[in-house]
Curated annotation (Swiss-Prot):
HAMAP family: ATP_synth_delta_bact. GO terms for cellular component: plasma membrane; proton-transporting ATP synthase complex. It is a peripheral membrane protein. InterPro entries: ATP_synth_OSCP/delta_N_sf (IPR026015), ATPase_OSCP/dsu (IPR000711). Transmembrane segments: none annotated. It comes from Methylibium petroleiphilum (strain ATCC BAA-1232 / LMG 22953 / PM1). Keywords: ATP synthesis, Cell inner membrane, Cell membrane, CF(1), Hydrogen ion transport, Ion transport, Membrane, Transport. This is ATP synthase subunit delta. F-type ATPases have 2 components, F(1) - the catalytic core - and F(0) - the membrane proton channel. F(1) has five subunits: alpha(3), beta(3), gamma(1), delta(1), epsilon(1). CF(0) has four main subunits: a(1), b(1), b'(1) and c(10-14). The alpha and beta chains form an alternating ring which encloses part of the gamma chain. F(1) is attached to F(0) by a central stalk formed by the gamma and epsilon chains, while a peripheral stalk is formed by the delta, b and b' chains. Pfam families: OSCP. GO terms for molecular function: proton-transporting ATP synthase activity, rotational mechanism. The lineage of its organism: Bacteria, Pseudomonadati, Pseudomonadota, Betaproteobacteria, Burkholderiales.
C-alpha cells in the first residue's frame, strides 16, 4: 500500500492546487465517486486490457459515476488512465480528501454506535465532540451492535470509548486484578 500512497500523492497534491478555493469539497466528492468506481476489480481488468482504448475506459468510468465531472477532475482521470495508474485512484481520493480537510480545519470522525443515531442527536453529539477534540468534525456513523450501548469515536489516532462493552471490560479488569 505504501507504493500506491507514493504514486497517489503527486496526483492528489496537483489536483488540490488546481481546485479553486471554495470548490475543493465538491471536487472531493467527484474524486471519491471515481475512486469507488476504480476500486472495482472487474473495471481494472477491463482498463488493463490492451484491446481497450483510453477513451473507452474514460467514458466507462465517467459514465458509471453518473455525475458531470468538472474539467480538473476529468483531466485527473484522463492522466491516470493514460499513465496506467487507475488502480491508484482510490488512494488519490483519500489523500485529496485529507488535503481538503486539512485546509479547512476539519477532521473526519467515525462514530461507532450499537443503535442508529437520530440526526438531531448526532448534531448534539458532534457539537460535544468538537469541544472535546478541539476541532471541527465531519462525522459518519457506523453501526456496531457488539458495543451493546454508548458510542466509540475515532478521530485520526484518538479514540473516545464510552460504550457499554468498554465499561464491562474495565469492570472485568478491575475485578480480576
Amino acid at each position: 500500500m505504501a507504493e500506491l500512497a507514493t504514486i497517489a500523492r503527486p496526483y492528489a497534491e496537483a489536483l488540490f492546487r488546481a481546485a479553486p478555493k471554495g470548490e475543493a469539497a465538491g471536487w472531493a466528492e467527484q474524486v471519491a465517486a471515481l475512486g469507488a468506481v476504480a476500486a472495482d476489480p472487474v473495471l481494472r481488468q477491463f482498463a488493463d486490457s490492451p484491446k481497450v482504448a483510453a477513451q473507452q475506459v474514460f467514458d466507462l468510468v465517467a459514465g458509471v459515476t453518473k455525475q458531470t465531472l468538472v474539467p480538473g477532475v476529468q483531466n485527473l482521470l484522463r492522466a491516470m488512465i493514460e499513465n496506467g495508474r487507475l488502480s491508484a485512484l482510490p488512494e488519490v481520493a483519500a489523500q485529496f480528501h485529507a488535503l481538503v480537510n486539512a485546509s479547512s480545519g476539519v477532521s473526519d470522525a467515525i462514530v461507532y454506535s450499537a443503535f442508529p443515531i437520530e440526526p438531531a442527536a448526532l448534531a448534539d453529539l458532534v457539537a460535544t465532540l468538537e469541544k472535546r477534540f478541539g476541532r471541527r468534525l465531519s462525522a459518519t456513523v457506523q453501526l456496531e451492535p457488539e458495543l451493546i450501548g454508548g458510542v466509540r469515536v475515532v478521530v485520526g489516532d484518538e479514540v473516545l470509548d464510552t460504550s457499554v462493552k468498554a465499561r464491562l471490560e474495565h469492570m472485568k479488569v478491575a475485578l480480576t486484578a
